[in-house]
């Protein structure tokens, strides 16, 4: 007799497949549970630009508009105004770009002044800041002392020039440099080794124009004095240690506020140094990059 086939010949094999699939599902679920959990907002936070990146991006964008002569002058003027603060923020938030941010902030100030003249907009002339209201700077002692020496030297030269009515020098400008010098040396806490008097023989022999040793270009002597002061101060800041590594600082700050303190200090110094560069440009120092960034 012929053996009859079961009504459901694949039941056992089907059951086995179901069991296998179920086991696979359990394993996958277990592996998923063991994977590293996603931290809410982590990826989003990692994609956010840092203050340095934001400042530099804003600065370069506004600088491009400022330099684009195909745009309306009003748009360029407004972009230049924004670039002044954007570059200053770059100097504060990006220590490696301190020189770039400071010099380009002054360059943007000069552009604002030139375009304001074309637009018949009254704008204040450059004025040297004197560290008024600054109680501390998160910069090492040696760097502050070097800046104090640079201010003292140009202050003496301006005093000599003012006495002889050379260039744009005035006693007020001389006093501002000397006041800044005194403030910086006080903030540094270092021994005061400033010379107070300096050899100005070469300056007196070339009171109108002189060869700028940094570029080899002829420029107004008083403008070169201001520019050299700014260069010395930028070099001093560049050589300064970071807040966490400084062996001696003008004022001790807590670790929780060290970054903010450093940024604020760099911002104040960038603004002060940009005053010197702005004044040099206003007095006729070349404003193109090859001269400024020599």
What residue ranges belong to the model's regions?
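All-alpha RGS (Regulator of G-protein Signaling) helical domain and cognate RGS-like helical scaffolds
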Residues: 2, 35-294
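Extended, charged helical scaffold/adaptor regions
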Residues: 2-3, 26
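Bacterial N-terminal signal peptides that target proteins for export
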Residues: 4-22
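Hydrophobic helical h-region of N-terminal Sec-dependent signal peptides
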Residues: 22-28
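C-terminal motif of bacterial Sec signal peptides marking the signal peptidase cleavage site
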Residues: 30-33
